[in-house]
Amino acid sequence: MPNMEPTTKEIKEQKIYQEMGLTDSEYELVCSILGREPNYTETGLFSVMWSEHCSYKNSKPVLRKFPTEGKQVLQGPGEGAGIVDIGDGLGVAFKVESHNHPSYVEPYQGAATGVGGIIRDVFSMGARPIAMLNSLRFGELDTPHAKYLVSEVVAGIAGYGNSIGIPTVGGEIQFDPCYTKNPLVNAMCVGLIEAKDIQKGQAKGIGNPVMYVGAKTGRDGIHGATFASVEFSEEGEQQRSAVQVGDPFMEKLLLEACLDVIRDHSDILVGIQDMGAAGLVSSSSEMASKAGAGLELIMDDVPQRELNMTPYEMLLSESQERMLLCVKKGHVEEIQALFERYGLEAVVIGQVTDDKMYKIIHHGEVVANVPVDALAEDAPVYHKPSKEPARYQAFQEEESFVPVMEDVVGVWKELLAQPTIASKRHIYEQYDYQVRTDTAVVPGSDAAIVRVRGTEKAIAMTTDCNSRYLYLDPKVGGAIAVAEAARNIVCSGGKPLAITDGLNFGNPEKPEIFWEIEKAADGISAACLELDTPVISGNVSLYNETDGTGIYPTPVIGMVGLVEDLAHITTQDFKNSGDVIFLIGETKAEYSGSELQKLQQGKISGRAPELDLTTEKKYQQLLLTAIQEGLVASSHDLAEGGFGVALAEATFKAGLGADVEVPFELNQLFSESQSRFLVSVKPENEAAFAQLMELEKVYRLGVVTEDDTIRVKHKEDQVTAKTTELRSIWQGAIPCLLK
């Protein structure tokens, strides 16, 4: 078949490079770097490697703001995943990754391959994946297409995670109209590693072979990285070829084989990296660039599952379940023998060179020859103009929303039926969250917890972000996202260690959007510094807009914490009647950005809830101390729906009730004031708990009751609700909406 690729002249004159994702100035920069016009393959290499998805060219100035260091950090940003130290020679590797655009076009495969990709990132570090989480955003469940997206995305996550045998243990889902045509699918993987086994994605040692392992290369996913770096349109729905297809059973074999190599052949393994976004070109050029080396690849040797593939297609394909290894000379047969035991191909496709060039050979001809750093390191970095949106000042000056609360119990029931608040059991029951048998706290509490085998320790993990707060005030909302994640870890008995961030925003070329990105990063950074949770990995997903309509700023925070002793594991549900109920933190009339405002006004506006990071840190440390001293029976973070929702949720599991008198007016029952915790303690621990919390804003509210009635009083006012009725509404809402 003749090669019909455009000539260098056609690429320039017809501006074909623009269709591939390069701007005029970027194309001119490539010409300047090469001292000539790039051919079609070279233009393709630069277009994907200089995409936002691979180069972070728009977000780098913002990412530099994040604190990335701490005594607990074993590996910060720059590798497949970040790693924190948990003692005993062990580390926890984790990262969040987005697969937003593919999940709108092809929701099952888009979500499934997002899971597969993040798993490979974690095991490429040498870590065994032990848990998956996800953070999902959809439009309102009022159209068949919205229901289809939810069902298919969840099925894709479940299909891949369940098949590969990694438990999906937690996550969050929010529903808002801005996500109708811009769903967000962020997957997080957590792995356990012996510190001595930490790997690097590098190709060094002149003459060392580079080996391709795993599935054969097809034409799926070509320009997937570019596809994820442009604004979406209705026509974009036709770009199904940019969505990859996953095979979890192949990935399971690849995972076990790679971990075998790392464990048993670390002396001959130089580096290992996943072929993710931008496929072979990304992994190979990054590995060489990190090592200060060059690379020569023979494309004829790349395993192919389709006929007549061009070097361009092989390099840019995002076919799944593929890894790239660099091994020491003379040991290829050993590596091949190991992979053959798993029925996997392991093929030498090139070698490390000393000239810092990225040379591609096909049919004996050099088809691309460019400086490797130009691809992997030297993408232009843009300092985008930033402008405060007009809405921000309007929100600051707006009269506060006052909810209609004539029928408090009626509002309570309505809130529990909102899909963002309602039980997600219908969704998480599709996930196998008990596989591997180490899940200590299953989905449905504040954080998931997975035991560390052979120790008394456990890992607490969560994903969090209330994007409505970020829409009102991205700096405050960014800080709240980190604070809430830490609250969830602490409520579960864990000490927060570090975060991974999935930065989902609209089009950064709009100054108002870039302002959101900058301010959100400022808020995240401030909270991470105060709470000592450095950013050790992450992902940026921009251009989440369709036909000019963008999402709320949605920086998903994935956080991991250490539970020092299994005895410290704490859940949100009340345990025994007679236990004493306390509220930590102050409740104010803060409804802007709340579920209640959305319910009653049909929109979000006003000033975001206040957050005092000093107070937040103090309350978290006090509560964690109380948990570690064995004083706490249950602990629950107050989030969407405020006190009323948290109190109801605490009664549901055991079907208990509560009799409480609150220090705030009943119309503030659903306020979303920050830095609050609902805690229950056994009567014999009440005095010790109260003494520990002395001088703080901690209120004794009442007791857990045996009947299934919740009574809430303030002075002369009282409301009463049946636990069973509230639970029925809460559990039935999402199955009903998805019908």
From Swiss-Prot:
Enzyme Commission number(s): 6.3.5.3
Catalytic activity entry: N(2)-formyl-N(1)-(5-phospho-beta-D-ribosyl)glycinamide + L-glutamine + ATP + H2O = 2-formamido-N(1)-(5-O-phospho-beta-D-ribosyl)acetamidine + L-glutamate + ADP + phosphate + H(+)
Binding site for substrate: S98, H99, N100, H101, R120, Q244, E318, S319, Q320, S541
Gene3D superfamilies tied to this protein: PurM-like C-terminal domain, PurM-like, N-terminal domain
UniProt cross-references to InterPro entries, sorted A to Z: PRibForGlyAmidine_synth_PurL, PurL_linker, PurM-like_C_dom, PurM-like_C_sf, PurM-like_N, PurM-like_N_sf
Binding site for Mg(2+) 1: E97, N539
Keywords per UniProt: ATP-binding, Cytoplasm, Ligase, Magnesium, Metal-binding, Nucleotide-binding, Purine biosynthesis
A single GO BP: 'de novo' IMP biosynthetic process
EC class (word): ligase
Chief subcellular location: cytoplasm
Any Pfam family: FGAR-AT_linker
Active-site annotation: H53, H99
GO MF: ATP binding; magnesium ion binding; phosphoribosylformylglycinamidine synthase activity
Chain sites annotated for binding Mg(2+) 2: D121, D274
Pathway(s) per entry: Purine metabolism; IMP biosynthesis via de novo pathway; 5-amino-1-(5-phospho-D-ribosyl)imidazole from N(2)-formyl-N(1)-(5-phospho-D-ribosyl)glycinamide: step 1/2
Binding site for ATP: Y56, K95, D501, G538
Cellular localisation: Cytoplasm
Task performed by this protein: Part of the phosphoribosylformylglycinamidine synthase complex involved in the purines biosynthetic pathway. Catalyzes the ATP-dependent conversion of formylglycinamide ribonucleotide (FGAR) and glutamine to yield formylglycinamidine ribonucleotide (FGAM) and glutamate. The FGAM synthase complex is composed of three subunits. PurQ produces an ammonia molecule by converting glutamine to glutamate. PurL transfers the ammonia molecule to FGAR to form FGAM in an ATP-dependent manner.
Record text on subunit structure and interactions: Monomer. Part of the FGAM synthase complex composed of 1 PurL, 1 PurQ and 2 PurS subunits.
NCBIfam families hit by this protein: FGAM_synth_II, PRK01213.1
Annotated family: Belongs to the FGAMS family.
Name the record gives this protein: Phosphoribosylformylglycinamidine synthase subunit PurL
Organism: Listeria monocytogenes serotype 4b (strain F2365)
Species lineage: Bacteria, Bacillati, Bacillota, Bacilli, Bacillales
Gene symbol of the encoding locus: purL
